[in-house]
Amino acid sequence: MSRVCQVTGKRPAVGNNRSHAMNATKRRFLPNLHTHRFWVESEKRFVTLRLTAKGMRIIDKKGIDAVLADIRARGEKI
């Protein structure tokens, strides 16, 4: 499974670790992903999404039905 939020589209970013001597080594900044199951009343079923903490806040604000409509409009299968 890829490390991509299904709501926000956030992906891993690449940057540097910096030591005290300012030596740079490559590293990845991973998104704060969680697998979360939501009850969708309109479909009478659970939907499992892999999303970040910010994605959960967006669902709290807009509602699961609106977010699912956005995801399906992008062509993702849920």
UniProtKB/Swiss-Prot annotation:
Signal sequence region: none
Any Pfam family the entry gives: Ribosomal_L28
Family affiliation: Belongs to the bacterial ribosomal protein bL28 family.
Gene Ontology BP terms: translation
Record-level GO cellular component terms: cytosolic large ribosomal subunit
TM helices/strands, residue ranges: none
Gene name, Swiss-Prot/TrEMBL: rpmB
UniProt cross-references to NCBIfam families, sorted A to Z: L28
Record key words, sorted: Ribonucleoprotein, Ribosomal protein
Lineage: Bacteria, Pseudomonadati, Pseudomonadota, Gammaproteobacteria, Pasteurellales
InterPro entries per record: Ribosomal_bL28, Ribosomal_bL28/bL31-like_sf, Ribosomal_bL28_bact-type, Ribosomal_bL28_sf
Record-linked SUPFAM superfamilies: L28p-like (SSF143800)
GO molecular function: structural constituent of ribosome
Native species: Pasteurella multocida (strain Pm70)
Name this protein carries in UniProt: Large ribosomal subunit protein bL28
